Regions:
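Extracytoplasmic
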Residues: 19-57, 70-73
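Residue-level signature of mid-helix packing/kink "hotspots" within the transmembrane helices
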Residues: 35, 62-71, 121
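Helix-breaking motifs and short loop linkers at transmembrane-helix boundaries and internal kinks
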Residues: 47-49, 81, 102-108, 119
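Paired small-residue
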Residues: 92-99, 107-116
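Cytosolic juxtamembrane N-terminal segment immediately preceding the first transmembrane helix
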Residues: 1-26, 30
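Small-residue-rich segments within alpha-helical transmembrane domains of MFS-like 12-TM solute carriers
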Residues: 31, 35, 101, 117-125
Length: 144
């Protein structure tokens, strides 16, 4: 199954529901990854020998990544099929978070959190367009 660039390609209800579920799982992962670090700050600070305010810079780095990545990645991926772009964005997000989990230094923590934030905004924007394009016009708001 592929998602066409042309809006309005209505999928059968079952296929649309599966695609929406997959995108919802991706959105849940991004939301969890964004906020989970706040609860882990004391552990991260202790493991890296940092203060909690220093670890707070990793949260800011993620937000900066979201701000930079949303327009940049949406533009760079404009020629790709949206389905492929969503998969690439989730891959980048997963790699950034995996690297964050094993980071040994403060600098790499901040850098990997920035990388993890890059796909966030573009993913939500593209997923909303895909979700609304898979269903009939009267169901678009609910799909998003």
């Amino acid at each position: 199954m592929s998602i066409h660039q042309t809006p309005g390609h209505v999928l059968p209800a079952r296929s649309a529901a599966k695609m929406e579920a997959a995108m919802a799982v991706g959105a849940f992962a991004i939301g969890t990854g964004e906020f989970a670090i706040m609860g882990l700050m004391p552990d991260i600070a202790q493991n890296l020998g940092l203060s909690e305010p220093q670890v707070g810079h990793a949260i800011s780095a993620y937000a900066l990544g979201v701000m930079v990545g949303a327009p940049l990645l949406a533009i760079l991926g404009a020629k790709l099929l949206r389905k492929h772009m969503l998969l690439l964005l989730m891959g980048l997000y997963a790699l950034g978070n995996l690297a964050t989990a094993f980071t040994p230094t403060f600098g790499s923590l901040v850098a990997f959190r920035f990388i993890s934030g890059l796909p966030h905004g573009a993913y939500f924007g593209i997923a909303a367009v895909v979700a609304s394009s898979m269903v009939p016009n009267d169901k678009r708001a609910g799909a998003v």
